[in-house]
Swiss-Prot record:
Polar residues bias spans: 347-358
Positions in the Extracellular compartment: 1-27, 89-96, 168-185, 294-299
Organism of origin: Homo sapiens
Annotated consequence of substituting Y310A: Decreased G-protein coupled receptor activity in response to serotonin
Protein known as: 5-hydroxytryptamine receptor 6
TM helices/strands, residue ranges: 28-52, 63-88, 97-122, 143-167, 186-209, 267-293, 300-323
The keyword Zinc-finger appears for this protein: no
Binding site for serotonin: D106, N288
Family annotation (InterPro entries): 5HT6_rcpt, GPCR_Rhodpsn, GPCR_Rhodpsn_7TM
Subunit structure: Interacts with MTOR, RPTOR and NF1. Interacts with CDK5.
Tissue distribution: Expressed in several human brain regions, most prominently in the caudate nucleus.
Keyword Cell membrane applies: yes
GO cellular component: cilium; dendrite; plasma membrane; synapse
Main localization, broad class: membrane
Length: 440
């Protein structure tokens, strides 16, 4: 972030001989800030350890999350504790030489967190809109280059201008004695805010809006394909039965409702992510520009807006993994939980639950989402516990060869509509399975 600047090494404020007494009633504020600091450090440390220790989470997409959690961890360990003392005592109570260093780390860590959020949105954008070419575009070396570029930009926007005094160019106001606040000039604030917030936030809005439109479009495609294939299968079997005109329409409505709910969930997810980002950071950057123009923001209000931006580093390790099913499973294996072993044994003992017709599940492949004929080597599912699979195989055997070749190919990105936050980047080689080809 670009905090309200503080004194440089050339300034000579009247630093206090020792820490002053904290104002009355600050005990509750100190307790709340300590909880925020502890939660930020613990949550980010836990998720970094989770990704490093769980092989299922070691992929290119999660590399950006490690960078995000690292920047947020630095905010919790390096930036928040001095900021808490600064807010409680109303002045800088640490060593004088640490003021400029802390200010530079404040700018760098918060800017790196915002830039990492931008990289995550770009990674999601490439993974959803072109999953088959994702591995060719987002290689580990390119991901490393993007992360290093984000950290380099954050460092250049913090240490270099502050050490060289660029933030004071054209600024006539002297620093307040004993304060550690960055009193930057308007040109510096505009350039730094544009590079570290406004441009990344524009990219985040663009990519997430494109993802939302693609998710809605693909949800409609999957619903129409599933409905059409179900009706084709019922016509091909041609089993004599009493006609029930309301059954097909009810099934179609159920499928359409299910996929509409998935699209709605995607919309809510993006709304939460974008809303959290802008609610925490936009007020601070607006106040930062206003402060550089008119110097009319009180220190207390500016501290509140600054801590609101800090809270983004607290919520990132909670919100982002909350919508990723692989993180939930890995967290259940990583943390000691008395119920987890029994649940895993129960799931392993009843494989028929995973092959039943329970509807499409997020994170599955296209063959598992749509009622496609199974490959010939899946004979293990032909027992009594998987009657749905044998019924699909019978449907495929009854199709005529001429009819099978006339089916249009499935869109290769249809599986992405199931849950665009749980796509596995390790399996981008998704090939459409031709409908109606006999498996024998």
């Amino acid at each position: 972030m670009v905090p309200e600047p503080g004194p440089t090494a050339n300034s000579t404020p009247a630093w206090g001989a020792g820490p002053p007494s904290a104002p009355g009633g600050s005990g509750w504020v100190a307790a709340a800030l300590c909880v925020v600091i502890a939660l930020t450090a613990a949550a980010n440390s836990l998720l970094i350890a989770l990704i490093c220790t769980q092989p299922a989470l070691r992929n290119t997409s999660n590399f950006f999350l490690v960078s995000l959690f690292t920047s947020d961890l630095m905010v919790g360990l390096v930036v928040m504790p001095p900021a808490m003392l600064n807010a409680l005592y109303g002045r800088w109570v640490l060593a004088r030489g640490l003021c400029l260093l802390w200010t530079a780390f404040d700018v760098m860590c918060c800017s790196a967190s915002i830039l990492n959020l931008c990289l995550i949105s770009l990674d999601r954008y490439l993974l959803i809109l072109s999953p088959l070419r994702y591995k060719l575009r987002m290689t580990p070396l390119r991901a490393l280059a993007l992360v290093l570029g984000a950290w380099s930009l954050a460092a250049l926007a913090s240490f270099l201008p502050l050490l060289l005094g660029w933030h004071e160019l054209g600024h006539a106001r002297p620093p307040v004695p004993g304060q550690c606040r960055l009193l930057a000039s308007l040109p510096f604030v505009l350039v730094a805010s544009g590079l570290t917030f406004f441009l990344p936030s524009g990219a985040i809005c663009f990519t997430y809006c494109r993802i939302l439109l693609a998710a809605r479009k693909q949800a409609v495609q999957v619903a129409s394909l599933t409905t059409g294939m179900a009706s084709q299968a019922s016509e091909t079997l041609q089993v004599p039965r009493t006609p029930r005109p309301g059954v097909e329409s009810a099934d179609s409505r159920r499928l359409a409702t299910k996929h509409s709910r998935k699209a709605l969930k995607a919309s809510l997810t993006l709304g939460i992510l974008l809303g959290m980002f802008f609610v925490t950071w936009l007020p601070f950057f607006v106040a930062n520009i206003v402060q550089a123009v008119c110097d009319c923001i009180s220190p207390g209000l500016f501290d509140v807006l600054t801590w609101l931006g800090y809270c983004n580093s607290t919520m990132n390790p909670i919100i982002y993994p909350l919508f990723m099913r692989d993180f939930k499973r890995a967290l259940g294996r990583f943390l000691p939980c008395p119920r987890c072993p029994r649940e895993r044994q129960a799931s392993l003992a009843s494989p028929s639950l995973r092959t039943s017709h329970s509807g499409p599940r997020p994170g599955l492949s296209l063959q598992q989402v749509l009622p496609l004929p199974l490959p010939p080597d899946s004979d293990s599912d032909s027992d009594a516990g998987s009657g749905g699979s044998s019924g699909l195989r019978l449907t495929a055997q009854l199709l005529l060869p001429g009819e099978a070749t006339q089916d249009p190919p499935l869109p290769t990105r249809a599986a992405a509509a199931v849950n665009f936050f749980n796509i596995d980047p390790a399996e981008p080689e998704l090939r459409p399975h031709p409908l109606g080809i006999p498996t024998n």
